[in-house]
């Protein structure tokens, strides 16, 4: 995250101290908000981190869930039960050599479907959060193009605006 801070600071996209950046990260990723946004009855029960790294189920559909470590842990704990992860396949879209891959995948989780998902595999959650944060700050609501291990990639981020503040709504490769 220090490199993300340095990048954003060097390019004038974040002007505070490292402590300010930590507080900003905590707020955009971990502060809870109402994902429905417009509901008459506000239910605070989601965060950017939960959506992107852990996943959510609503109306029998999986949303978010773009982290391979969480996917692996849930798949491992399923032990073939009908609840948990039912992995239906993947396609490697980009390969970063020994540093991981970018895949698209299809699966069910506790009976809910993820018809099309994408995630990095073999990368650290810290790297993923750093890349997503950079894209959120620099290219919010736009496609963020960059290279990872000399391989061109695209990351998409969406904001969730509540209480006059932009939180991470989602982020994915």
Task: Tell me the role of every PLM-derived stretch.
Residues 1-147:
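N-terminal "domain-start" segment
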Residues 141-173:
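A cross-kingdom marker for long, charged
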């Amino acid at each position: 995250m220090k490199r993300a801070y340095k990048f954003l600071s060097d390019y004038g996209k974040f002007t505070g101290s490292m402590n300010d950046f930590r507080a900003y990260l905590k707020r955009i990723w971990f502060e809870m908000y109402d994902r429905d946004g417009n509901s008459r009855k506000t239910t605070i029960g989601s965060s950017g981190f939960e959506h992107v790294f852990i996943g959510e189920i609503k109306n029998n559909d999986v949303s978010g869930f773009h982290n391979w470590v969480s996917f692996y842990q849930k798949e491992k704990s399923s032990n073939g039960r009908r609840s948990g992860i039912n992995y239906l396949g993947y396609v490697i879209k980009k390969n970063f050599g020994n540093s991981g891959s970018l895949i698209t995948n299809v699966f069910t989780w506790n009976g809910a479907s993820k018809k099309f998902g994408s995630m990095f595999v073999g990368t650290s959650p810290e790297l993923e959060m750093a890349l997503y944060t950079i894209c959120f700050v620099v290219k919010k609501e736009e496609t963020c193009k960059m290279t990872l291990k000399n391989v061109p990639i695209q990351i998409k981020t969406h904001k969730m605006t509540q209480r006059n503040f932009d939180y991470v709504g989602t982020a994915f490769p």
